[in-house]
């Protein structure tokens, strides 16, 4: 009824890592239908003057991509990286202030806005909107709601799925499939601009020649690993590398100071000292990134640095990509249950394979 299947079925034929049954077991069907029906009615009313587009044509040269609801850095990177398929068109971005900063100097996005009032509706012949959620539509309703639109996710509403592949396959579909699945699997990765200034700043850090980068701290309690000191101890004891660089946000400053005091000759910290993009350049200079699930894991995939990700409950396949050497370790109960031995063993394998 009304296309309810769209909430759990992808609009394209390619298969992506997605755990639909798990979502079904968690959320009863009546709740899922009521949520869909509410969004359906709101969308039909709010976008009644906006023609829904299922094919991006050559005439659609001026595009405003609106990415509003899922504004975490990792989600944003996964959702927007398929913009590489729109190169050659004028593409602007409307997103939240927090995420807008990482796209400065982008090779595809021309202008970046953080409020729909900044956008001139006469500048666009197509909107790409993230989804039909009410919050997303409210971000541009009014001056822009008469412009034809295409939706990335539409009504799709599943918790755990690989957003990056969804985005690439969906934009490829909207462009009438110029690329086959094998090509997309080979090239699909997060797209993150690293400017000449970012490179210059990081060059000034005089980083070691050969080092592992480790992200410490975390925003989410369930995604925060607390045994980095033990991991570092075993890495150094085994002689895997002699130098380790700590990165992350300022909330981990105290932890980084403790680790540096314990290993003053082997560990250096840039925790809380760099922008996201500058941190990505540090990762680019490393031979491996070790981290819990988070935005910097996607930065590693963007610069194609091998990555070992630690996950709580979430299957690594919904975050990792085929185009970069990445591996995940997961524990369903607690991320701290992932053994130090399994982490260090995988680090050895990833580095030996790289060499």
Language-model-derived ranges and their functions:
Residues 2-355:
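Catalytic machinery of carbohydrate-active enzymes
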């Amino acid at each position: 009824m009304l296309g309810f299947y769209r909430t759990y079925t992808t609009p394209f034929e390619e298969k992506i890592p997605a755990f639909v049954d798990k979502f079904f077991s968690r959320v009863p069907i009546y709740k899922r239908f009521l949520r869909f029906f509410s969004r359906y009615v709101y969308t039909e009313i709010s976008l009644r003057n906006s023609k829904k587009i299922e094919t991006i044509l050559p005439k659609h040269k001026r595009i405003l991509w609106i990415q509003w609801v899922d504004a975490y850095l990792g989600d944003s990177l996964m959702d927007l990286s398929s913009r590489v398929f729109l190169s050659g068109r004028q593409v602007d971005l409307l997103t939240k202030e927090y995420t807008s900063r990482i796209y400065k100097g982008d090779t595809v996005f021309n202008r970046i806005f953080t409020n729909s009032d900044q956008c001139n509706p006469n500048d666009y012949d197509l909107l790409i909107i993230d989804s039909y959620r009410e919050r997303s539509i409210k971000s541009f309703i009014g001056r822009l709601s008469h412009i034809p639109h295409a939706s990335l996710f539409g009504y799709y509403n599943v918790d755990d799925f690989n957003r990056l592949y969804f985005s690439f396959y969906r934009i490829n579909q909207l462009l009438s499939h110029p690329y086959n699945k094998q090509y997309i699997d080979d090239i699909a990765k997060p797209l993150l601009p690293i400017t000449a200034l970012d490179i210059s700043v990081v060059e000034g850090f005089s980083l070691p020649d050969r080092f592992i980068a480790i992200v410490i701290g975390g925003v989410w309690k369930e995604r925060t690993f607390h045994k980095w000191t033990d991991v570092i101890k075993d890495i150094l004891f085994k002689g895997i590398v002699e130098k380790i660089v700590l990165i992350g946000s300022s909330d981990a400053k105290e932890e980084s100071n403790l680790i540096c005091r314990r290993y003053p000759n082997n560990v250096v910290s840039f925790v809380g000292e760099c922008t996201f993009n500058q941190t990505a350049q540090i990762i680019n200079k490393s031979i491996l990134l070790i981290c819990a699930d988070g935005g910097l894991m996607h930065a590693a995939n963007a610069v194609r640095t091998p990555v070992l990700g630690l996950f709580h409950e979430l299957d690594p396949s919904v975050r990792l990509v085929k185009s970069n050497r990445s591996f995940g370790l997961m524990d369903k109960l607690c991320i701290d249950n992932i053994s130090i031995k399994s982490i260090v063993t995988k680090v050895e394998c990833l580095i030996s394979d790289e060499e």
